[in-house]
Every structure is written in structure tokens, then in C-alpha cells.
Amino acid sequence: MEETVDDPPTSAVLLDHCHFSQVIFNSVEKFYIPGGDITCYYTLTQHFIPRRKDWIGIFRVGWKTTREYYTFMWVTLPVDLNSESAKQQEVQFKAYYLPKDDEYYQFCYVDQDGVVRGASIPFQFRPENEEDILVVTTQSEVEEIEQHNKELCKENRELKDSCVSLQKQNSDMQATLQKKQEELETLKSINKKLEQTMKEQKDCWEIELLQLKEQNQKMSSENEKMGVRVDQLQAQLSNQGREMEKLVQGVQDKTEQLEHLKEENGQLFLSLTEQREHQKKLEQTVEEMKQKETTAAKKQQELTDQNMDLSKRLSENMIIHDVLQREKEKMEKENDYLKRENNRLLSYMGLDCDSLSYQVPTSNQGGTRQDPGLVFGNPYSGIQESSAPSLLSIKKCPTCKSDFAADVFDHNLALEQHLQTLSLNCPICDKTFPAKEKQIFEDHVFCHTL
């Protein structure tokens, strides 16, 4: 359903067909070709007066309320309603807003109150068939059709005359009906006001009646209560006379009891004094307990803080332990590598570990000193003493002055691996420390954990 910015006035009330003849649609085709604009011609009857918000809509056949329009166009108000040209009006629907299916539709004129004032015959939107374009008939059929057309034209004129007469009668009846409806609306309004007034008056009377009934019930109840109260007072008076005698006797008894109570009061006063002194002692004890509790709480807090500090230090020590463990594994791997290299060199020179152990000097003979960092000693010192200088070329480590045989294996690789064993690398930032600065290395790793 197509709508514009300003929607037309509609009604959700099911409408009757009593007002459909006030606007008559003329020259409505049985079908319209899709894709083209269509013009709707209509005639305003004598007693119908158009208004600014009246509109013409296209409705699908079978509609119930004026809200079911497919599209609509506002009507144009005539300048002079009394002229004949003002009664003949037209409105054009653009092809873009027209339905695209082949259902049956009809034009409906709706006033600004949402009341339908006229409806056209049904029509369709479909293309032309060949039967609609070309029709071939015989001469006799043509004559018969012409005769039939003459009869239809005559009948049409008679029907038009009858229609005009009926329209006039309908217009008169519509005017009368309009007056009656206005009178009926006036009477309904008056009746509604009277009913409202009567209802309000009735409500006031009912409220007053209920109030009177409630007051009557209250008075009756109070009267009954007063009678009961009088009986009760008389009974109380008799009882009070008897009680007075009892009270006189009771006063004497009470006097004796008072003397006895005075003696007990003195004893209780002494007991109360003792209890107050005992209470003061208890309060002092409670105060001391509170102070002890405060001291215990402070001590517990200190222990908690110490526990947290120890936990933190434990986690830091665990990190350092992991770092040192990895460094230890690295050193063990390097030591294994050096052992394998040592065995390979010994095998290359025709020596074994057992024979080499006898060649290693046990003291500082020959001006050389055993490096305490090597597990199996310096294998090259024995080789230097037992081998001729012509067989091996000896080179020294620039850090620890250890000997390396350059003719046996790659001196640069061996030297690099040897230097790695003499340094400590930080596993976090890869900073290198000499092996003799182990404490500085551990402090550096510990700083990363802070």
C-alpha cells in the first residue's frame, strides 16, 4: 500500500452503503493497461459539498474499512460549487503508484471524516488481449449488433432518466436524512448530558444513603454499648464496695509487709554494693582482655606480613633456582661436549684416558698450573710434554691461558665454545657476565624478579 507524507483521514469502522451514491464515477473501464497513467472522472451530486481533506483511493474489491486503500490522490476543490463544470471533476493517478497484479479494484471517494461517499464499478490492471484489438463479424451479425445497440441505447436513456429521477429523490432523501441525523445527534447529546446528570445525582444520593445507614448503625451500636456499659458500672460499683473492705484489711497486711520489706531492702542494698564492686573488677578484666586481644591481633598481622614476605622471597628463590638449574644443565652439556672432544683428540693422537692420566703432572712443573675449573684436567698439557713441537701447533685461551691445538680441529669453534663455559648469560635479557662474577650475575637475575 502506497502512502505519502500526509496520510489521508480514514476510519476503522465497518461502513454501510447508504452514502455511496453522493459521488458518481463516470467512464470507468473494465480494465486498464499496466504502465500508464489513468484518469478518474467523477460527478458530485447536488447536495454533496466537497471539503479540503477529501480524497479518492483505489481499493481492492472486498475491502472492509477505508484504511485498506492501496493508493490515493487528494481531490481538487471547485471554485464555484453552483456551476455545472464544478460538478464534473477528475483526478489522475500516476503509473508508478498503481497496483501491479490483476486483482479487481475500484475507485472510492472518501470525505475528511473517513466516510465513503461514492464507489465505482470494479476494474482490472492487465494487458490487452488480441480479442480486444480485432473482432471480425458478418454483416448479419453487424445488423443484429446495431439493432441490439439501438435497443440498449434506448434502454440506457430510459435508465439515465430513471437514474436522474432516482438521484433527485435520493438527494432529497439525503438532505432529509442529514437533517434527521443532525437532530438525532442533538437529541443524543442532550440525552447523554441528562443521563450524565442523573447518574451523578444518583451517585450522590447513593453516597448520602450509605452515609446515613452507617451513621444509623453507629448510633445503634453505641446505644447498645452504653447499655452494656451501665450494667458493667453497676456491677463494678458492687464489686468495689466489697473490694473496699478487702482493701482495708489489705492495708493492715501491707503495713506489716512494708516493715518486712524495709529490712530486706537494707540487706539488698548491701548485696548491691558488693555486686557493683564485683562488676568493676569484671570491667577491668574485660579491658585487660581487650588490650591482650589488640596485641594478639597486631602480632598476628605482623606474622601475616612476615608470611607474605617469606612467600615472596620463596617465589623469588624459586625463580633463581630455575635459572641456576638451567645454567647447570647448560654447563653439564658443555662439559659433556668437552669430554667428547677430549676423547676424540686422544683417539686422534693414539692415546686413551688411562694413559693420559699418568702423563698429567701433579705439581707446577715446567712453569704450568692446572686449571681448577676443568673436571678432567688440561688434556693438552700432557700432549705438549709428550709430543714433539713439530706435530702440533699450540695456541692459548686469552682468558684462562689454556692451550688449544690448531692443527687438530677448528681453533675458532673450540675457542668460542670454551669462552662460553667461562661466562654466565642472563636468561631474561641475554647479558653476559664473567664466570668469576657469579654473585653479580645472581643479583642481576634477582633484579628481574622485582
Swiss-Prot record:
It comes from Bos taurus. Zn(2+) binds at C426, C429, H444, H448. The lineage of its organism: Eukaryota, Metazoa, Chordata, Craniata, Vertebrata. GO terms for molecular function: zinc ion binding. This is Calcium-binding and coiled-coil domain-containing protein 2. Xenophagy-specific receptor required for autophagy-mediated intracellular bacteria degradation. Acts as an effector protein of galectin-sensed membrane damage that restricts the proliferation of infecting pathogens upon entry into the cytosol by targeting LGALS8-associated bacteria for autophagy. Initially orchestrates bacteria targeting to autophagosomes and subsequently ensures pathogen degradation by regulating pathogen-containing autophagosome maturation. A motif (CLIR) lies at residues 133-136. PROSITE patterns: ZF_UBZ1 (PS51905). It comes from the Eukaryota. Residues 371-381 are annotated as: Interaction with LGALS8. A motif (LIR-like) lies at residues 203-206. GO terms for cellular component: autophagosome; autophagosome membrane; cytoplasmic vesicle; cytoskeleton; perinuclear region of cytoplasm; PML body.
